[in-house]
């Protein structure tokens, strides 16, 4: 959601005591609405006039692996459980983890995300995300725009590397992509910088150690199961904050106040839809925006092959609305 090449212009000092400020007194803020089950974080930039103090969070003192559960053990239990007993056998976070695992088991997966960010000064920014899985290759597009700035990113992952394109244009649902506007990194390098590779089906850590059980639930709705997950705003975002910082070239990692995810699963524990809501503080260009809120709604389809868009092909977001 940001223009990474944006350089604020300066106005002349009117007095000796007055410091130089950017012409707009602005910052580019990462808005982190993220794909809950399949995707990379959808980060974006917002122009804000909001000078506030920033309390940074030392995520480096926390080890990601310490907050993740044993997936193999859970999957083994899941495969031995009768489908009519899912709700009584598994906790909300276990159901979410199984559903995310099931996403990875489909050869073809598609997720379309439609979101909105609300920030200080009444600034609003649209969010679009498009994710495709085709066997062991992955595509992800993130487009987010306000009236002033936006960010356009495409990611293509194969067996060995991730190729990242930075697009141009102001349209809220498409961009111009050029071959010269790309970088390629190995998958380990990408995961180190961005928090997770595209084959990992979420940026968030949803586990026994990151889920607030007294504020989470799983209920039956016809043949579906509806999950309401309140996550710890510190430990659940250890991967996610890397993505936000890399996407928007932030001064520091954002500090989260709230992470809530609603998920609807079918009777086979496939994800039908998700809605993510977040509140956080973020700092860029030395300026802080507090209590930025964002939401993203995603819909999922499976087992329908769709070719990855080339640089002249736009993603179709109409089916996600």
Residue spans of the language-model regions?
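Beta-turn initiation residues at beta-strand->coil junctions
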Residues: 113-118, 142-147, 165-168, 275-282
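Short amphipathic beta-strand and strand-loop transition segments with alternating hydrophobic
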Residues: 129-130, 208-220, 262, 303-306
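Buried hydrophobic residues that stabilize the cores of well-folded domains
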Residues: 52-59, 154, 162-165, 271-276, ...
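Gly/Pro-enriched, hydrophobic low-complexity segments
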Residues: 225-315
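An acidic-aromatic
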Residues: 123-195
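Short, hydrophobic/aromatic-rich segments at coil-to-beta transitions
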Residues: 104-112, 137-139, 221-228, 246, ...
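Flexible, processing/modification-adjacent segments and terminal tails
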Residues: 163-224, 229-230, 234, 238
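N-terminal leader/targeting segments and the immediate start of mature chains
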Residues: 2, 6-128, 312-321
């Amino acid at each position: 959601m940001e223009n990474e090449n944006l350089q604020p212009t300066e106005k002349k000092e009117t007095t000796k005591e007055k410091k130089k400020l950017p012409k707009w007194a602005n910052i580019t803020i990462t808005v982190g609405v993220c794909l809950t089950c399949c995707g990379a974080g959808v980060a974006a930039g917002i122009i804000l006039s909001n000078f506030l103090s920033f309390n940074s969070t030392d995520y480096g003192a926390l080890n990601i692996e310490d907050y993740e559960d044993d997936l193999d053990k859970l999957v083994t239990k899941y495969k031995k459980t009768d489908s009519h007993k899912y709700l009584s056998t598994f906790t909300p976070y276990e159901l979410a983890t199984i559903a995310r695992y099931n996403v990875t088991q489909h050869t073809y997966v598609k997720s379309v995300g439609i979101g909105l960010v609300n920030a200080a000064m009444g600034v609003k920014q649209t969010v679009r995300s498009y994710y495709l899985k085709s066997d062991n290759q992955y595509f992800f597009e993130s487009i987010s725009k306000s009236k002033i700035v936006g960010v356009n990113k495409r990611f293509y992952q194969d067996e060995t590397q991730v190729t990242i394109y930075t697009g141009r244009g102001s349209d809220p649902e498409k961009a111009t992509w050029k071959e010269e506007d790309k970088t390629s990194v190995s998958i380990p390098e990408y995961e180190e910088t961005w928090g997770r590779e595209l084959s990992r089906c979420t940026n968030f850590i949803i586990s026994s150690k990151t889920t607030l059980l007294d504020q989470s639930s799983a209920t039956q709705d016809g043949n579906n199961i509806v999950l309401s997950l309140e996550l710890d705003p510190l430990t659940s975002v250890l991967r996610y904050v890397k993505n936000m910082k890399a996407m928007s070239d932030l001064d520091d990692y954002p500090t989260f106040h709230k992470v809530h995810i609603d998920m609807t699963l079918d009777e086979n524990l496939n994800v039908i839809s998700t809605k993510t809501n977040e509140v956080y503080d973020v700092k860029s260009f030395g300026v802080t925006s507090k209590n930025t809120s964002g939401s993203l709604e995603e819909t999922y389809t499976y087992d329908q092959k769709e070719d990855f868009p080339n640089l002249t092909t736009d993603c179709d977001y109409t089916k996600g609305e």
